[in-house]
């Protein structure tokens, strides 16, 4: 397992980290029980994974993760969780919601602190008000030792060009230790501005869902390629994978981890076999010719899925 640094914090994170969101929601949607989750986490740690990402919005995943990590020394892994300011009728303006959220997260995760406390799904049009209201309380939580670092995550479905994350880094580079965005074969837009900005502000980049959902579902890939004028549809990337779906996913992870600006690539699965395959993929680099062709053909891509 390779490790990269979280900005200027000095903390090191595994190149592949584990996410409890995604389609399976840490096995909540696939019938995995607590013993299965513990086995998954144990295997991840055995293979060198040291960052586990969760959120208050991921069903019961925080409590499940807390139980799965029990018995592992707290200083051997990192936990990132998220709090959402968004509400059905807009956004909350009560700073106490962030305090209540982290207190509940700490209880469920059975820990005294999290390593990264993130604002979940920041929309660029909300950022000015959001930062004015919530940055002071988040900094207070950091000073109190309830979180080591502060981060923000994007709302990819409405912001595939990462304006929100770029705005966060531009406005408050001294506040945010990390941003979470998507960079992959089907969404390379971050390379134009967000990734260079992360370098200049020494901000860690957590790469979420780099192969989901397009590379894992031929019908989605066909739909997206048809939109982009690729007549080959779902076979447009057969040159990369020899038509093998598992190989395409591995290539997708390799592409996602290639930029040095990327700190870690988050993988969410309820399958130990899939986890092992994703980690194994990152033990190899994508061939230079493949990398250059993907950047040449899809460098302007900004797919929300």
Locations of the language-model features?
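N-terminal binding-site loop/beta-alpha segment at the start of enzyme catalytic domains
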Residues: 1-77, 137, 143
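Beta/alpha (TIM)-barrel catalytic core signal, keyed to glycine-rich beta->alpha loops juxtaposed to Asp/Glu
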Residues: 3, 122-305
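Short, well-ordered coil/turn segments that N-cap beta-strands
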Residues: 11-16, 48-50, 73-77, 111-115, ...
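Active-site mouth loops of central-metabolism enzymes
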Residues: 22-35, 83-99, 121-128, 157-161, ...
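Conserved, mostly hydrophobic/aromatic
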Residues: 6, 18, 44, 52, ...
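Short, acidic/polar
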Residues: 31-44, 93-109, 158-169, 248-253
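A short, structured active-site edge motif that brings together acidic residues
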Residues: 75-89, 119, 181
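Active-site groove signature of glycoside hydrolases
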Residues: 106-125, 129
């Amino acid at each position: 397992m390779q490790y990269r640094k979280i900005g200027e914090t000095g903390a090191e994170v595994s190149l592949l980290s584990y996410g409890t969101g995604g389609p399976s929601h840490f096995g909540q949607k696939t019938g995995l029980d607590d013993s299965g989750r513990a086995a998954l986490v144990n295997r991840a740690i055995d293979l060198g994974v040291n960052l586990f990402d969760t959120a208050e919005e991921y069903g019961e995943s925080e409590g499940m993760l807390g139980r799965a990590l029990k018995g592992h020394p707290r200083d051997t892994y990192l936990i990132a969780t998220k709090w959402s300011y968004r509400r059905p009728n807009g956004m909350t303006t009560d700073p106490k919601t962030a305090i209540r959220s982290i207190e509940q997260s700490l209880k469920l995760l059975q820990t005294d602190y999290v390593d990264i406390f993130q604002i979940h799904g920041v929309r660029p049009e909300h950022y000015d008000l959001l930062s004015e209201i919530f940055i002071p309380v988040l900094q207070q939580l950091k000073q109190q030792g309830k979180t080591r670092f502060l981060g923000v995550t994007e709302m990819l479905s409405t912001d595939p060009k990462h304006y929100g994350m770029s705005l966060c880094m531009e406005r408050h580079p001294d506040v945010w230790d990390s941003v979470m965005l998507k960079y992959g074969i089907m969404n390379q837009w971050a390379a134009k501005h967000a990734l260079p900005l992360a370098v200049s502000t020494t901000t860690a980049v957590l790469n979420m869902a780099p192969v989901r959902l397009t590379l894992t579902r031929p019908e989605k890939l066909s739909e997206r390629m048809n939109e982009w004028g690729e007549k080959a549809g779902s076979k447009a990337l057969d040159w990369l994978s020899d038509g093998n779906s598992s190989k395409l996913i591995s290539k997708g992870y390799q592409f996602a981890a290639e930029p040095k600006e990327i700190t870690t690539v988050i993988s969410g699965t309820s399958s130990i076999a899939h986890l092992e395959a994703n980690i194994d993929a990152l033990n190899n680099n994508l061939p230079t010719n493949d990398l250059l062709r993907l950047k040449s053909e899809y460098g302007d891509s900004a797919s929300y899925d």
